[in-house]
Amino acid sequence: MRILLINPNRYKFPPVPPIGIEYISCSMEHAGHEVEVLDLCFSDDIYKDIEESINIFKPEIVGLSVRNIDSVLYHNNEFFLEEMRDIVKFLKYNFNLCVIVGGTGLSTNPEGVVDYLGADVGIVGPAEETINILIEDIKNKSLRSSIYHGVLRKDVSCKRKIDAIDYKIYYENGGIAGFETHKGCSSSCPYCIEANKRVFLRDIDHVISEIKDFVSRGYNHFHLCDSEFNEDLDYSIEFCESLKRASLDIKWTAYMKPSEFSKRLLKLMRDTGVYLITLTVDSYRKCTMYWSDVERFVFTAKPLGIKVVIDFLTGFPYEKEEEICENINLLKRLLPDKISVNTYIRLYSSTQITKIIRGDPELKKYLIGNIEDDSLIRPVFYNHITSDDIKKIIGEDPLFIIEGIEKGVNYCRV
């Protein structure tokens, strides 16, 4: 069948290439389908470009990538689904096409997102294998559900169609290429839609091959798309050893958690081109050992010449201001390169923190946003420590930024 894959993500702080579409398109082509990719990120007229692409390619199915449903942060929040919904309406009204949606954004509320967009069906989770099953069901007019759950029954070794995306324009506008070493996350952070998802480790040789492909095209700056690189310490070390043997002249940045690391790993990361690590830290029911791990991480990475930025999420239900102040002062003493503080917790119907807040009527007064909508599709935040409260704690210290007020990501601003 002929499938048109559309990237509707037009957020540019920074622009992020749609890596998922690259994997999916390659998987579908391997299964014998014809695939065309339409990237709308830098489009001047999205509907003109969509119409032109459809008239030339004549697809039978359209796939729409939903990377995020909004920009996640409270300050300067942008809601993305309205424009995506308009695109779906345009596709169905003008061309009567079957529309599939997929991507990380669906995990927030699968049925709710599919219904809001008016799509025919959605895939939740890794779609590299499931997409071809779904296409066959559409072809045979035998859809089993409005939601298909992505499952990888083998090693994550799906190849990637890098040619599908114009990386030159992304690099020219502050974006960089990404790569991933695994899918899923074993952590149980109560605020995260990726928590407790089965982990699939990718074939290391395939990941290195992807990076080599980019380098051969003149691109050598990368960010890691994994939620946290050190999901599996042994695998992370093995990956870095393989990358070091490849002797590639690259630089890259990664997110990590303050556990499952060693000096050996951090040295290997430095030796393979890592210049910046964003350490994800939160204050939800943390013990003394957790804060010791944070300290040990910073004190191990910094002497190796690696910049460390701490992304600190705090202000959870029942946390007192003095506790938050104590934790901020602890992080300040570590002297990382920057500390980004966020006290506005985005709620999703699928997360544990939402269940906790909904279970206590006294917490409802701390909700901000479209609080009458139980689907939580439109942004709703929990906040009882405001940005003004945080400003009083951090003062004018340039070490700190309040997340969201200044748009951008750490590899753009550190």
List where the protein language model places each region:
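C-terminal accessory regions of radical SAM enzymes
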Residues: R2-Y11, G20, K307, E322-V414
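Non-cysteine beta-strand/loop elements that form the S-adenosyl-L-methionine
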Residues: G63-V66, A127, L266-Y284, D337-R346
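Acidic, low-complexity intrinsically disordered segments
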Residues: M1-R217, H221
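Catalytic cores of alpha/beta
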Residues: P110-L117, L265, Y318-R333
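Short helix-capping segments at alpha-helix termini
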Residues: G32-H33, L91-N96, K244-D249, P303-I306, ...
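Radical SAM [4Fe-4S] cluster-binding motif and immediate context
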Residues: K159-T314, N329
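Short glycine-rich, flexible loops that bind phosphorylated cofactors or substrates
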Residues: I69-V72, I131, E231, K286, ...
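Conserved strand-turn element in the central/C-terminal portion of the radical SAM core barrel
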Residues: L40-S43, K257, V281-T288, V298-E323, ...
